[in-house]
Amino acid sequence: MSRRLFTSESVTEGHPDKIADRISDTVLDALLARDPRARVAVETLITTGQVHIAGEVTTTAYAPIAQLVRDTVLSIGYDSSAKGFDGASCGVSVSIGAQSPDIARGVDTAYERRGGGTAPGGPGDELDRQGAGDQGLMFGYACDETPELMPLPINLAHRLSRRLSEVRKNGTIPYLRPDGKTQVTIEYDGDKAVRLDTVVVSSQHASGIDLDSLLAPDIRRHVVEPVLAGLAEDGIKLDTAGYRLLVNPTGRFEIGGPMGDAGLTGRKIIIDTYGGMARHGGGAFSGKDPSKVDRSAAYAMRWVAKNVVAAGLASRCEVQVAYAIGKAEPVGLFVETFGTATVDVERIEQAIGEVFDLRPAAIIRDLDLLRPIYAKTAAYGHFGRELPEFTWERTDRTEQLIAAAGL
């Protein structure tokens, strides 16, 4: 088989775009905690010394947005001008309006309830009432490369970025700063990951730190080597002998965070999902309540794809769903198994339709999405972390899928 190199990247919670995502999701959580039916679309721009919040919110709740911004920035680690940003003294501006009544009309009373047809529950089904918050297409993906059923490149990149933040916070490498990035290149033999080719780690650091004598050895010893050891402990077989490690390839990374680059909500959508291994519909997640199918349907598609793989119906599965704004029922469902299906793909698609209700209200109900759980999703991937709050990572429909597929 042909041998190819595939690369995925991750960033730490201190990357400017991830600060923005975290702020947006923290505001969302604060509103959902007080009003689970809040309609929220919050965008954040962070730059040198300033944070700007904008968007649309319709709610009965109050949230102290400026204080939430400051607390979030400080919790990430930006607490001093020496680090390029200080959450205690930065400027915060807030410009929030209400959700458009034209959008609200379609979400509150779906096309099906306005005489456009009836969804599977039949007349009077309450799940027919809520329409999709926008048109669009969303993808979900799963594969058997890791125990979490995620692609190995993004899985490993996230492990490295989490470890990079961990050694900064626990003082193992005390001179690190919050901003950081990781990148992993893995060699594939056909569809099988066989060898680690290259690891890139870039981390913001205090001034006066020598790359060759201090930073690079510390990163290898305290970040990369423990993470690679963890792969073996998790039963992931990968040849890691002789891999290339590049640490801060520019030679210096003292200016980082919002001083180095402006950050925006929703600008790391490939890192948030599958590291480029699967397609993406284009919609970002952070700052959006679950009436926005950009978020809730993407979570549902991960749930669907993961259950298909866990059920043994395929070893790789990508699922696409599509919606029209204001309509409850999806307008399209597409399943791709890349030649790995154990039954006809048509049977898998039919089984998905029988087992999963993909109307927005049903997704919100089944995944219990009206909870303040979203700040935890903002860094290190929305998928592949099996936390109790991440209900879309459950493999609780495998038996139903197997039965529906006729196995």
UniProtKB/Swiss-Prot annotation:
Binding locations of Mg(2+): D17
Cofactor note: Binds 2 divalent ions per subunit.
Catalytic activity: L-methionine + ATP + H2O = S-adenosyl-L-methionine + phosphate + diphosphate
Positions bound to K(+): E43
Keyword ATP-binding (UniProt): yes
A cellular component annotation (GO) from this entry: cytoplasm
InterPro entries in UniProt: ADOMET_SYNTHASE_CS, S-AdoMet_synt_C, S-AdoMet_synt_central, S-AdoMet_synt_N, S-AdoMet_synthetase, S-AdoMet_synthetase_sfam
Annotated binding of ATP, by residue: H15, D179, G180, K181, R252, F253, D261, R267, K268, A284, K288
Gene Ontology terms: biological process: one-carbon metabolic process; S-adenosylmethionine biosynthetic process
Main location (coarse class): cytoplasm
Gene3D superfamilies assigned to the protein according to its UniProt record, in alphabetical order: 3.30.300.10
Binding-site list for L-methionine: E56, Q99, D261, K292
EC number: 2.5.1.6
Start and end residues of each stretch annotated as Disordered: 112-131
This protein's name: S-adenosylmethionine synthase
Lineage: Bacteria, Bacillati, Actinomycetota, Actinomycetes, Kitasatosporales
Gene: metK
